[in-house]
């Protein structure tokens, strides 16, 4: 899995002008699924996301997790995180999982996150518009194959 975590004051995702999901303080996740992702990748990503201390404490130090601040997650599927830009000027996305597998994996990922924090989400495969107010900004890239 490849994920981009953005600490936000608020975020929303819309489809055809209608809001599909929205949160206040928390994390916007852009989620890419690879063809060889397995249960271990899912468990690792969920554990990291819910426990990562990237929210400020009373002293202004990044010392609190999303659970500590009682924040929410807005999860948006994004196969383009697997873009291969080595050849030419048009990215190839052959490194991403096939849609059927990726959709099921994305659903399980969100279900497991929801065991810890409230999760809003976009619609897998839809053309979405994402709005956010970054907080910091704090942006973290997480690749489950690099641990």
Curated annotation (Swiss-Prot):
<comment type="similarity">
    <text>Belongs to the DTD family.</text>
</comment>
<comment type="function">
    <text>An aminoacyl-tRNA editing enzyme that deacylates mischarged D-aminoacyl-tRNAs. Also deacylates mischarged glycyl-tRNA(Ala), protecting cells against glycine mischarging by AlaRS. Acts via tRNA-based rather than protein-based catalysis; rejects L-amino acids rather than detecting D-amino acids in the active site. By recycling D-aminoacyl-tRNA to D-amino acids and free tRNA molecules, this enzyme counteracts the toxicity associated with the formation of D-aminoacyl-tRNA entities in vivo and helps enforce protein L-homochirality.</text>
</comment>
<keyword id="KW-0378">Hydrolase</keyword>
<keyword id="KW-0820">tRNA-binding</keyword>
<dbReference type="GO" id="GO:0005737">
    <property type="term" value="C:cytoplasm"/>
</dbReference>
<feature type="short sequence motif" description="Gly-cisPro motif, important for rejection of L-amino acids">
    <location>
        <begin position="136"/>
        <end position="137"/>
    </location>
</feature>
<protein>
    <recommendedName>
        <fullName>D-aminoacyl-tRNA deacylase</fullName>
        <ecNumber>3.1.1.96</ecNumber>
    </recommendedName>
</protein>
<dbReference type="GO" id="GO:0019478">
    <property type="term" value="P:D-amino acid catabolic process"/>
</dbReference>
<keyword id="KW-0694">RNA-binding</keyword>
<dbReference type="GO" id="GO:0000049">
    <property type="term" value="F:tRNA binding"/>
</dbReference>
<comment type="subunit">
    <text>Homodimer.</text>
</comment>
<dbReference type="Pfam" id="PF02580">
    <property type="entry name" value="Tyr_Deacylase"/>
</dbReference>
<dbReference type="GO" id="GO:0106026">
    <property type="term" value="F:Gly-tRNA(Ala) deacylase activity"/>
</dbReference>
<dbReference type="InterPro" id="IPR023509">
    <property type="entry name" value="DTD-like_sf"/>
</dbReference>
<dbReference type="InterPro" id="IPR003732">
    <property type="entry name" value="Daa-tRNA_deacyls_DTD"/>
</dbReference>
<dbReference type="GO" id="GO:0043908">
    <property type="term" value="F:Ser(Gly)-tRNA(Ala) hydrolase activity"/>
</dbReference>
<keyword id="KW-0963">Cytoplasm</keyword>
<dbReference type="GO" id="GO:0051500">
    <property type="term" value="F:D-tyrosyl-tRNA(Tyr) deacylase activity"/>
</dbReference>
């Amino acid at each position: 899995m490849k994920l981009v975590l953005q600490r936000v004051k608020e975020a929303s995702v819309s489809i055809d002008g209608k809001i599909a999901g929205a949160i206040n303080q928390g994390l916007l996740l852009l989620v890419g699924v690879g063809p060889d992702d397995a249960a271990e990748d899912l468990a690792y990503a969920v554990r990291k996301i819910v426990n990562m201390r990237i929210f400020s404490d009373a002293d202004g130090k990044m010392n609190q997790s999303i659970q500590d601040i009682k924040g929410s997650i807005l999860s948006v599927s994004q196969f383009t995180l697997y873009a291969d830009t080595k050849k030419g000027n048009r990215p190839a996305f052959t490194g991403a999982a096939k849609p059927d597998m990726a959709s099921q994996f994305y659903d399980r990922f969100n279900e497991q996150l929801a065991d810890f924090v409230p999760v809003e989400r976009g619609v897998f495969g839809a053309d979405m518009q994402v709005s956010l107010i970054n907080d910091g900004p704090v942006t973290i890239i997480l690749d489950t194959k690099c641990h």
